[in-house]
Amino acid sequence: MAAAVLTMTAFQGGQAQAAAKGAKKPKAAPAAPAPAAADGKRIFTTTCAACHQASGEGLGEQYPPLVGSEWVSDDEAKMVRIILHGLTGPVDVAGQTFSGAMPAWGAILKDQDIAAVATYVRGAWGNKSAPVSAASVKTIRSATLARTTPWTVAEQALVKK
């Protein structure tokens, strides 16, 4: 009978913990899930689709497609740097040159928002690139914090992965 009696042994964080002989320790909370696809799609729709279109196919000669783009499937850091700080000057995508400038979103979007939209784009419309984590965005943001101007294609080529 004594083994069945629970005793209050500690109060942590305002919650009582009961201990009993043979009781198992509680499991750690599971890790936070990757950014939800719905969040990425919502952010894309409100911040990116006006130029890149809901279909990801871009617009005319100004805004490049994201469908099958090497800028999407390449190193995730390149895409994150562009979302954070923008891109200016001509850019070649799928053999076509585009002249529109990409605005910087780093001052507006949080790390988890950038991770969500990058993950969405990297997995939408037949793209099959790995998800981007908020931790990765945070690292890239910290490494480029002093940057105040949009990237150019030439500068992106010089940045090591």
Predicted features and spans:
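Electrostatic cytochrome c docking/interface patches
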Residues: 14, 18-43, 59-62
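Flexible coil segments in periplasmic/lumen-exposed cytochrome c-class electron-transfer proteins
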Residues: 20-30, 109-161
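Sequence/structural segment immediately N-terminal to covalent heme-attachment motifs in c-type
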Residues: 33-59, 72-85
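Sec-dependent N-terminal signal peptides
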Residues: 1-16
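Extracytoplasmic electron-transfer domains, predominantly the class I c-type cytochrome c fold
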Residues: 68-131
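Short amphipathic alpha-helical interaction/hinge segments
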Residues: 56-59, 87, 91, 129, ...
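Cys/His/Pro-rich metal-binding microdomains
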Residues: 49, 64, 103
